[in-house]
């Protein structure tokens, strides 16, 4: 009996996998888009606008959110058509080398100043200047994604002279990160995105946060996108990239 159950379970697993492949093949023939990123406000807004534009004729948009290395995995495995990530300039060459090794073709989008985002509970929120020094930040706790707490990018705080051996808050989602910013004195190491561009005439999702540029910083925040070398861009993927490029223009 145990042998029979094991045999049937194996067959069932194969049938489920086959069904998944069939459905995936069907989805590829729909008006669809799959995009992976590290979780960006501008990308969610752009995809939402795209969805509203085409929803009357039927559209499927799938957004993946993960850290930089896993975004590359998603594109390489064809789970996502395109990937959009931020890479600190000090790590960029090594990251691009990894992309090339996986036959992923990259394109530069923008080079931004490094900044920090704070909520109303942070003493920096009410300052007059739009800049903050590393020395000031060393007195405050950071909130960060788990891949910034350990791993190949964890020394960015040392490189920026922000090392704080005290408390820190580690999260795995964007929603949790901004909840922490709202309720603590933590700061988030960010990029100087042009937040106001997408918020013109619309309620701002960032009205209760403030982003300050890091003074005297020679490291930059590089925004890039990539795809598989053999992937032919679809109408929707082209529209997304064109919109992202215009956002940073």
Task: Please state what every model-predicted region is.
Residues 44-46, 92, 126-163, 233-237, ...:
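Secondary-structure junction motif
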Residues 1-24:
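Alpha-helical "hinge/linker" immediately C-terminal to small N-terminal DNA-binding modules
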